[in-house]
């Protein structure tokens, strides 16, 4: 939930610009950065955010480095007590969206510390999509069941 962002001590942003896509979320990330010394990593283009972050790569392929424990940011995620992954819908809607979502889900499962809090978050750009998902209006053709991961 958005409240959990304030408790995060490590956040991985994947293909997302929370400053423009979700200003309230960005304010919560900034609060975590200031209050919790939250470490933030970004995969995607360099951005002008309101807090410091470690730019990991412009390429979404870097997600494979993280899933294979070949990144320095893995140490940050492993040490974190409340890690979060925030995936932007623009990366999911790309040609490699299914792979990005699968890899993000696997990484989230690896770093999950609290069984009550799922570290994987999808930042939707359209509130109407969230409403549609809540009433189970979505494409039934999915290769994997992410709720079981």
Task: Show the residue positions of the predicted features.
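Catalytic alpha/large subunits of respiratory electron-transfer oxidoreductases
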Residues: 1-149
